[in-house]
Amino acid sequence: MVKRRLSAFGNAFLIYFIIFRLCCCSPQTSHWCKYPALCLKSPDTHNENLVCDAYLSVIATKSEEKEASNPTTWDFTPTNKYQEPSFHTKTSLNGSDTISSNFLSKYEYSNGTSTSEFIDSISPPLVNETSTISSSKKLEQNYSVTEVIDTNIITSSSVTLPISEDGSSTSAAATIDSNIDEKTVAFSEEKRFNFASTDCAAAVIKTNPEAVGSSSILTENKDKYMLNKCSAENKFVVIELCEDIYVDTVQIANFEFFSSIFRDFKVSVSGKYPKYESSWMELGTFTALNLRTLQSFHIENPLIWAKYLKIEFLTHYGSEFYCPVSLLRVYGKTMIEEFEEANEDFLEQKVNDGSAIKADEIRKPQESPIFVDEEDTDVQSKPVRKNPSVELNSTDTLLSSTVISKSLSTVVIGNETGKSESYPATSTRSFNDISPSSSSSYSTAQISTFPSNQESIYKNINKRLSTLEERKKAFDEIVEKILTNYGKHNAKNMNFTQLLHELNSTLQLEISKLSKSVVKPSLFALQAKLELLSAENEYFQSQITSLYQESSFQKRLLMLQLTVLIVLTVYMAVSRLPENLPTTRSSSNNPIEASRPPFSRDEQDISKANDFRVSASSAVYTVGPELLQRKKRDPNTSIRSIHEREQDKIIHSRSHSVC
């Protein structure tokens, strides 16, 4: 049993070795390969694509035949649809797409084979799946493969892809880096700073709900990627960049096999994170190639200084389940870089203007004055040469961006015939752009590359400083005129001051004479009257003081008399009281009981209550010894009647004493 298994294993290993020798050969060993088109990978190169060397093997085999006169075509179909050629694509000036293969080849082949036959023979998937190549109408171009020694440098072997005769092309040019592991990258983008990297604190702000691992696209690790379902309706990613930049290049890559590659996508930017989707500013819609390499997309008009970048994936190649994105890079210019470039251009223009002015001074042409209209005052500047090849402004007053204040809003230049034309001060036309036959001149300013783009803060500050300098110059001119006028009137002011001084001295002399003759005698008389009045005032004050003292004495005497009168009145009233007032309980030894009246108020209340509410028999009275004696004298008289009589006597005696 073991022997059978070992023999089967040996047979399988032998079959595998034979197939490997037949199919996995290199271009250098293609002279003994029976099927060079089946070569999968070259051991001498580090290319990740598995079909490039197969194409090279076909080219090398055909190059050995050296059939330049007879066009040769090849029929080749890749063994795997995911094994795609690694091409470096860029847009040339004439509009044709140039593909440069990054591989090592020691063969040179050149014949009259048309480009359509070459593309159809060696790369059917690229032609069929890419919308940028028209299979019906193609221009015939020759191709060549040249020898390159260093494998780390992109070779000069290239193939010019055909374009349609009507000039149609893609909406954006895609630059594909076939070997991102190598040091040399197309357009030297690798040397630039990536503003969508986690090294500078860039972050993924938002993605569609189906996206997984979105932060992986900001790292350089090829094994990590943002995974997205191709069936998702709205696939997007929002990234916060490191700084506010002018976005000029976006690079996207998908290195994953057995997955669909993005095709059409839209790039939008915003300075602040927008609340609404309509706030995003679209930079363009781009079409990528069906290649698993780093693809570059250049943006012509960045519009604004972007802090947030949004990429929406619209379509994709193939019909796989997942549409991953492995890497994203964003390149651009910061505000300070834009300002430095503008400053360099300004310095170059300043040097050119200075040389032009020096050359014009030698010619000594006819001069004509220039007038500047202001809101309130017309200011005439120095004459300027009429030659249109000379700039209007000198090197001392030339600014990086011509921004004149409201007071210097219009420039009017006269000519020999008396005609004049007015132009705003923000005109971007210079003297160098006008032919010598022109009859008018224009002010100079820099021409911006993108006039609709948002200006940087440094450029805005520079413009404000330029405006401030212009206003200061205008202010200095006005102050100089004012000082000139002041100098003219200064002599008149001095004469007027001297006249006032002489008049003042004359008036002082006249006033002193008048005071000596008139004012002093009157002053003496007034002083005598004042002394007399002060003496009379002192006499009146002494009289008033004596009267006050007398009145206070009389007041005290009156109070004393009133007091004595009151005392006498009280005494007389007390002395007139009757002496025989009846008293009750006089025999009592208690003085308090003796001083009590015959009956108290409580007893009166009781008697009144008995009169009105109770019968006479139930009345209670206090009976003294006198009442008992009277009762004995007159038994028919009741105690009540006797008591009433006594009360009448008491009341009568009291009223009499008071009277």
Curated annotation (Swiss-Prot):
Q: Keywords for this entry?
A: Endoplasmic reticulum, Glycoprotein, Membrane, Signal, Transmembrane, Transmembrane helix
Q: Where in the cell is it found?
A: Endoplasmic reticulum membrane
Cysteine disulfide links: none
Keyword Glycoprotein tagged: yes
Pfam families associated with the record: Sad1_UNC
Q: Which residues lie on this side of the membrane: Lumenal?
A: 26-556
Ranges facing Cytoplasmic side: 575-659
Q: What membrane topology does this protein have?
A: Single-pass type I membrane protein
Location of the region described as Disordered in the Swiss-Prot/TrEMBL record: 417-445, 580-603, 632-659
Question: Composition bias, kind Polar residues: at what positions?
Answer: 423-434, 581-592
Instruction: Please give the name of this protein.
Output: Uncharacterized protein slp1
Record-linked InterPro entries: Suco/Slp1-like, SUN_dom
What task does this protein carry out?
May be involved in membrane protein folding.
Please indicate if the UniProt record lists Transmembrane as a keyword: yes
Q: In which family does this protein belong, per the annotation?
A: Belongs to the SLP1 family.
**Signal sequence: where?**
1-25
State any GO BP term from the record.
protein folding in endoplasmic reticulum
CC annotations in GO:
cytoplasm; endoplasmic reticulum membrane; membrane
Segments passing through the bilayer: 557-574
Q: Ranges for the SUN domain?
A: 173-335
Entry's PROSITE patterns?
SUN (PS51469)
Entry-listed glycosylation sites: 94, 111, 128, 142, 393, 415, 495, 504
Q: Where is the composition biased (Basic and acidic residues)?
A: 641-651
Subunit: Interacts with EMP65.
